Regions:
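Intrinsically disordered, low-complexity, positively biased terminal segments
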Residues: 6-7, 12, 17-21, 31-42, ...
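Conserved G/P- and acidic residue-centered "switch" motifs that form tight phosphate/ATP-binding loops
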Residues: 24
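Amphipathic alpha-helical hairpins
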Residues: 29-33, 49, 68, 80
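Conserved catalytic-core motifs of GNAT/GCN5-like acyltransferases
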Residues: 39-48, 55, 60-73, 191-203
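Short, polar loop motifs at secondary-structure junctions
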Residues: 47-50, 176-177
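Short loop/helix-cap segments at secondary-structure boundaries that form the rim of catalytic
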Residues: 53-54, 74-77, 182-184
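Conserved N-terminal entry element of GNAT/NAT acetyltransferase domains
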Residues: 69-86
């Protein structure tokens, strides 16, 4: 469980070894996490088969996230810059709007991960989107991918893929944004996994049409 601020936290997945499943250990883990985060609103991405269990605890479905994968094929695009060249306060403000909660300490570390690339889109002198591509167990993952418009998201996707060309790359897209799905399909990405985004006290007010990729299934 990650506490982002006084009002919001996010649950990662619970993994119980097969021989211990069905004995209540998973529910106990959830209860410990709930105690840890207190009265905050909680978000999570439930894997198939787990949504009903979380609903019994008061969580409600918001939308589906689908992970798409492809071989990274991209190119540099105009107006795309290293995100660290942009004043951090601007990046943090943009992220807060699109994530639904301030996560300043987390964000500073996220965009500075080793062997990762964080890029921003500048339009008319201001930040109009950003994305991060980071190494994972198999290739790379893009997340988050936030942008004011589909063409900006496309430019960011291409520029991020250019940095890791030829490697497997994944993008976790909210299905509630049809333009996010269209981006994945346009670049011939294939769906490989899905999860249900759920919240305990209601979904934060989010510009869903600007969210093309969530940060991760484990972190929100």
């Amino acid at each position: 469980a990650v506490i982002y601020n006084d009002f919001f936290a996010f649950f990662g997945g619970d993994i119980v070894r097969p021989e211990y499943r069905g004995q209540g250990y998973g529910m106990r883990l959830i209860q410990v996490k709930q105690t840890y985060v207190g009265r905050r609103n909680i978000g999570l991405d439930a894997v198939p088969g787990m949504a009903e269990k979380y609903m019994r605890l008061g969580f409600r479905e918001a939308f589906r996230n689908v992970r798409y994968e492809a071989k990274a094929v991209g190119q540099d695009r105009p107006g795309i810059v290293d995100l660290r060249r942009i004043p951090f306060r601007e990046v943090a403000a943009y992220d807060t709007v699109h994530f639904g909660a301030a996560r300043v300490g987390f964000l500073r570390r996220w965009i500075n991960q080793p062997d990762s690339f964080a890029l921003g889109a500048i339009r008319q002198g201001r930040l109009a989107g950003f994305g991060v591509v980071r190494p994972c167990r198999r290739g790379y993952r893009i997340g988050p991918l936030f942008a004011d418009a589909p063409d900006i998201a496309d430019d960011l996707y291409l520029a991020l893929c250019h940095r890791v060309a030829g490697k497997p790359v994944a993008l976790d897209t909210p299905q509630i944004n049809p333009e996010a799905v269209a981006l994945a399909e346009r670049h011939k990405m294939k769906p490989v996994r899905e999860a249900t985004r759920m919240y305990l006290k209601g979904m934060p007010e989010l510009p869903l049409d600007h969210i093309f990729g969530v940060t991760s299934f484990e972190l929100g």
